[in-house]
């Protein structure tokens, strides 16, 4: 089981989406609120922009795919999401911003959290001069047997 995301308080109640956005320095616009509710009011999850766009459209909200992409990147810059690049051009956004890794279920592309302390990464190369390693993402690919 992975660590709780910072969006969840100790007593398992949720911070309201409006409060979460304000604390991150973002104005709670209609679009941000609609997308934020889907992302943050519930269990931690992994979504693509296309999946989130389909979900918000299914609720009758009119939010363009470009706005979904822009909002996800705003949430990421504000520290509310992590972005995971899988399969080159496919990006997932993770509401659990704690230090953890992932299982990738092939072929459907579903991501599942691995607890932060379940994998130990050793023997990393020295980064080039003037650079530092900020994060290592491990994706363990799974297939049904």
Predicted feature descriptions by range:
Residues 43, 48-61:
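DNA-recognition alpha helix
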């Amino acid at each position: 089981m992975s660590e709780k995301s910072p969006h969840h308080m100790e007593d398992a109640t949720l911070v309201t989406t409006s409060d979460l956005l304000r604390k991150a320095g973002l104005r709670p616009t209609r679009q941000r609120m609609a997308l934020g509710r889907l992302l943050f009011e519930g269990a931690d999850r992994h979504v693509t922009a296309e999946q989130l766009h389909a979900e918000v459209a299914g609720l009758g909200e009119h939010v363009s795919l470009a706005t979904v992409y822009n909002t996800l990147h705003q949430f990421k810059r504000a520290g509310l999401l992590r972005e995971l690049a899988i399969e080159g051009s496919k990006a997932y956004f993770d509401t659990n911003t704690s230090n953890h890794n992932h299982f990738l279920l092939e072929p459907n592309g579903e991501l599942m959290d691995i607890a932060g302390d379940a994998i130990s990464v050793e023997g990393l190369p020295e980064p080039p001069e003037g650079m530092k390693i900020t994060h290592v993402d491990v994706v363990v690919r799974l297939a049904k047997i």
